[in-house]
Amino acid sequence: IQIEKSIHDYMVNSISYDYEALRNKSMNRCSFNIYGVINNRLAVCEGIAKFVKLTLNKLGIECFICGGKCTLENEKIEDHAWNIIKIEEDYYHIDVTWDIRKDDAQNKRIVSYDYFNLDDANISRDHFDFNMSFECTSMLYNYHAIMGRFISGKKQLIQLLSDGLALGKNFSFRIKRTINTPDNIDDIVVETFNESVKYNGTNGKQYYLSANKSQLTYYVTVG
C-alpha cells in the first residue's frame, strides 16, 4: 500500500492535467503517453494510467489499465482511463487522474484520495461502461478505511470532526454509503461540520469544507 500511495502522492503533487490536449490531440500527443508525465509533468488520463501501470508493474505489483466512461460535474460524459491494482487477493480501482483534478474550497490543489482503492459499487457512482474479467468487491484497502475515516454514523462523524479540528490541520473523510443513507446526507455533513466548528472554536483560523458528492468524500482545509 505504501508504494502505491507514494506513486499516487507524487503524481498528485507533481503532474498537471493537460486540458489543452483534449482540444488538440495532434499537437499534444506526448500527454497521451508516459513521455508527457516524465518530461513535461503534463498528461491526460491515458498517459497517467500508463505511467501508474508501468511503475507498479516494474515494482512487482499487478496493475492494469481500465477503460470506460466518466460523468463530469457538469453531467458531460467523456471517455476515460484509470487503473485497477491487485492487493493480496482483491482488486481495487484507483483513478489518479481524478485525484489530480481535485481542488479544495479555496481552489487550491490538494492531495485527494477520493479514488484511491475503490470497489465497483463506489467507482460506479461516476465511472461506467468498464468491462474487466474480474470484480472489485473490497474496500479494505481504501485510503479512508485504512486511516479510520470511513464514517458510518453521525456519532463517528462528530468525533472525527472534533479530533480533526483540534489538530488544526487539513484532513479528509468518506461517508459509507448504505441502503439506509439518507438522500440529504450532504446537508447533514455540512450542518454537522458547521456545528463542530462552532462548538470546538476556531482558534483564530478559518475552516473550509469541500465535497465530492458522488463519492461522499469531504476535505477540510485550514485557512
Can you say where each PLM-predicted feature lies in the sequence?
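Hydrophobic/aromatic-rich core segments of domains that either
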Residues: 47-122
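Acidic, metal-dependent phosphodiester-chemistry machinery of nucleic-acid enzymes
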Residues: 35-39, 218-223
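Short, well-ordered strand-loop elements centered on a beta-strand within folded domains, enriched
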Residues: 34-36, 40-42, 90-96
